Amino acid sequence: LQRRRQRQMCIRDRSKIVSVKAKVYKWTGPVQKIHENFCTNAADIVNQENISNDRWTTYKFHSWLVVEVETSDGFIGLGNAALSPEPCKSVVDTYLAPAIIGESIWDYEHIWQKMYRQTLAWGRKGVGMTAISAVDIAIWDALGKSAKQPVFKLLGGKTKSKLPCYASKLYSQPLDSLAKEAKDYVDQGFKAMKLRLGWGPTDGAEGMHKNIELIKTVRSVVGDNVDLMADVYMGWTFEYAKRMMRLIDNENLRWLEEPVIACLLYTSDAADDVAS
């Protein structure tokens, strides 16, 4: 036992963080234009004058942040962040990297708390948490390489012989092409799939019925033995969500994902109504 502890201490001494590098990679090739009502977006209700161009601006992935955490024993862990990569790079370079250089990657909980607490005044969500996540992923990647084990082993190991998965695409599109895409997933053997709903509060009652058409179209193709889910990307208001959920109730969805902005659940009296 004493030898084992000595070995663990030796590993900790060798696995100190010596550098943290953040780099933004930018896509410079052609970009396919996103059509109107591709998917709902939380910014829709404030972008009325230019909604067709701005509908999906908050989720465009034309840049990508990659974080490298290098250890004293020569391992390099990789992490990444897709949303707001440029601001996240600034957070990593200015706040996170100086705070964790010299720490052992095996003290990962201490490192996480250190990053979180040093960004608490302006962090706690958004860019701050995204930057912390990118570094945290890189640390776990370095841990796996150092231990010569896949990270899932370090997190507790296998609990099942296999895991269910679902097809997650089915963005709003003409109904015939939506049906074809759903049929392709059935042919591939998927027993669950998730679609995106393209209309929100600014589209009124007509948009509600268009959302229902999307769901009914997919359901008619996949049948009742396939789980069906829908994602809204926080594009609805409380009032709209309540009205839509009454219409959706008969469509046998397994879940409705992110109907409203999550933090509003803690500040609005309507939260209990939506939950019920």
PLM features per residue range, with description:
Residues 1-7, 11, 266-276:
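Single conserved hydrophobic/aromatic residue that forms the stacking wall/gate
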Residues 12-72, 82:
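Structured beta-strand/loop patches that form or line metal/cofactor-binding pockets in enzymes
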Residues 127, 136-168, 172:
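Glycine-rich, aromatic-flanked loop segments that form ligand/cofactor-binding clefts
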Residues 162-265:
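Metal-dependent enolase-superfamily TIM-barrel catalytic cores that perform enediolate-based chemistry
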Residues 81, 137, 142, 195, ...:
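Generic detector of well-ordered alpha-helical packing
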Residues 59-60, 157-159, 221:
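Solvent-exposed alpha-helices and their adjacent loops that cap or buttress functional pockets
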Residues 54-55, 70-146:
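Metal- or metallocofactor-binding catalytic centers and their adjacent structured scaffolds
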